[in-house]
Amino acid sequence: MTAATSAPADPHGPAAGPRRRAGRPAAAVLDQNGITVAALELIGKSGYDGFTMAALARTLNVAPSALYNHVSSKRDVLVLVQDHLTSFVDVTAFEAGDWEQAVRDWAWSYRDVFSKHTPLIPVIAVLPVTDAPKTLAMYEAVSAGFSRAGFPQERIVPAIVAIESFIFGSAYDVTAPADIFDSGTMAASTPHFTAAVQRLAEEGHDKPADVAFRLGLEALLAGLGALRAA
């Protein structure tokens, strides 16, 4: 399998496919791609809390039972959405040969895409990649890059999992409240932590989540880089 191609421009828009008339699609176009398009449209309007199979059926102008001819559950629809979103994760730098920069680009892109879709993370974190073509294309590109960089084959998947675990947690951090580490009335009993939080605030970073992500990612790169063959 060849490496994934350049990431499309809009990671949160409709899935690629033939354009249709404005308005609800006819039942004749109901397929997995059409379901993915409608699911993204519904999520964009109502968020994940408003995403139900009944609401999706209304968006598609079909009976709920018609959906189940193509997907067996809401989870299956989320799998389709996840696979579509994964196609917007940028893995093109792995073709250039600079492993560290490729991992940086991949990790930042991965985090940015899924920071807007954190309700999917508990699903995809335990989701088999079987029959998810865009997800598998991403992993193939990353694995090929790791292999070319001199990683022992048996270390490639554990290294990817380690980085992904960090990415998924960091995606939540992007939308965390600014006062998440405010110790409040317990400041006196947690002086070291409170001082560290205050010192970070004094740095005046616009995006503290980016500071943490950069620090953690560079530490991962340094540690994992030691596994590469000389």
Whereabouts are the PLM-identified features?
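N-terminal intrinsically disordered/low-complexity leader segments
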Residues: 1-30, 195-203
